[in-house]
């Protein structure tokens, strides 16, 4: 889909942390003329959840996790002087988009750096989006101003390994938490998958 939205004489180009839109704000690079588009990594991961809400209705909802990575030509040095790609105009742009894009109903709540993201400069070259529907608002702790998903953020650096008790296997820990606190289960399941994808990309 084209991302430029015309308003009168102005054109507003969207910020696209995944860098999949041809008309993202960094493309093309004015400095290098390179096409600033990332590649999708693998398939979109779908995490299905089923729960009963406060009204007693059974709700089924799927969280989608999309990962992207800058192709090698964007990460390679540029020009005769072998300028570091991170020092280019688009390198600066992608650095400002380091984080996981949390999207609710097609609108970004926040670009979260709460997940397993350290100061390694290579983090600028990937993008991850977590997309969910409003029926998960309470479970994920969406704030009234729709700027964060606090319950998800609170476990963002966790994995299922952190919840194993005694000699529990990871499978047993998942089942126990799911039975004890389903909201926590959903948040940990998402965080675990996101951090696994970050680790595999890096």
Positions of predicted regions on the chain:
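ATP-binding catalytic core of ATPases
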Residues: 1-3
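N-terminal non-catalytic structural scaffold regions of very large proteins
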Residues: 5-30
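Charged regulatory segments coupled to nucleotide-binding catalytic modules in large multidomain enzymes
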Residues: 21, 29-202
């Amino acid at each position: 889909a084209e991302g430029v939205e015309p308003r009168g004489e102005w054109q507003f180009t969207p910020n696209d942390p995944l860098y999949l839109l041809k008309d993202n704000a960094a493309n093309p690079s004015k400095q290098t003329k390179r096409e600033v588009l990332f590649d999708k990594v693998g398939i979109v991961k779908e995490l299905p959840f089923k729960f009963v809400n406060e009204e007693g209705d059974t709700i089924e909802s799927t969280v989608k996790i999309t990962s992207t990575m800058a192709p090698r030509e964007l990460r390679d040095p540029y020009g005769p002087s072998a300028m570091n790609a991170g020092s280019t105009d688009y390198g600066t742009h992608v650095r400002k988009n380091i984080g996981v894009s949390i999207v609710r109903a097609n609108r970004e709540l926040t670009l979260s750096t709460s997940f397993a993201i350290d100061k390694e400069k290579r983090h600028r070259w990937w993008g991850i989006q977590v997309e969910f529907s409003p029926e998960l608002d309470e479970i994920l702790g969406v704030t009234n101003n729709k700027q964060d998903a606090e319950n998800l953020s609170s476990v963002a650096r966790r994995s299922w390994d952190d919840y194993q008790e005694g000699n529990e296997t990871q499978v047993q820990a998942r089942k126990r938490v799911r039975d004890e606190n389903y909201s926590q289960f959903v948040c940990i399941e998402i965080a675990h998958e996101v951090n696994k994808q970050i680790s595999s990309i890096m």
